[in-house]
């Protein structure tokens, strides 16, 4: 049984509230879970101490048993000092695409041609 520490959505429409739960990876998002270990209320301000509430002792026990936190929960655990989160790096994503490079080359070529024409007209 693969265990995950993940979010289960509660609350009403347009008013989300999430429970941080330990659940089997195959169970539905809001379905059966083994234990509730915290909560997250995104409607509260980021500086509010009740925005994210965690039961640190139980989370440490479940991680020791092999439960894997999801990305969002791992972010909360890292902020609380309960887990390490590796910094993401994708330098390829920042590079411009092939079409963008072609457009920039065309634009530079037109600007050079215009500059040469104005210099020739000024002589």
From Swiss-Prot:
Any matching Pfam family: Ribosomal_S16
Keywords tagged on the record: Ribonucleoprotein, Ribosomal protein
GO function terms (MF aspect): structural constituent of ribosome
Entries under InterPro entries matching the protein: Ribosomal_bS16, Ribosomal_bS16_dom_sf
CC annotations in GO: cytoplasm; small ribosomal subunit
Region span, Disordered: 85-107
GO BP terms in the entry: translation
Gene3D superfamilies, sorted: 3.30.1320.10
HAMAP family membership: Ribosomal_bS16
Family: Belongs to the bacterial ribosomal protein bS16 family.
UniProt-recorded name of the protein: Small ribosomal subunit protein bS16
Annotated organism of origin: Allorhizobium ampelinum (strain ATCC BAA-846 / DSM 112012 / S4)
Gene name linked to the record: rpsP
């Amino acid at each position: 049984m693969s265990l995950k520490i993940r979010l289960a959505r509660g609350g009403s429409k347009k008013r989300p509230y999430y429970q941080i739960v330990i659940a089997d990876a195959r169970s539905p998002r809001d379905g059966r879970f083994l234990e509730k270990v915290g909560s997250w209320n995104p409607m509260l301000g980021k500086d509010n101490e009740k925005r994210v509430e965690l039961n640190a002792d139980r989370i440490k026990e479940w991680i020791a048993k092999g439960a894997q936190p999801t990305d969002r929960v791992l972010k909360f655990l890292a902020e609380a000092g309960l887990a390490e989160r590796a910094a993401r790096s994708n330098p390829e994503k920042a590079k411009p695409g092939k079409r963008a490079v072609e457009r920039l080359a065309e634009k530079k070529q037109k600007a050079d041609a215009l500059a040469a024409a104005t210099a020739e007209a000024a002589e």
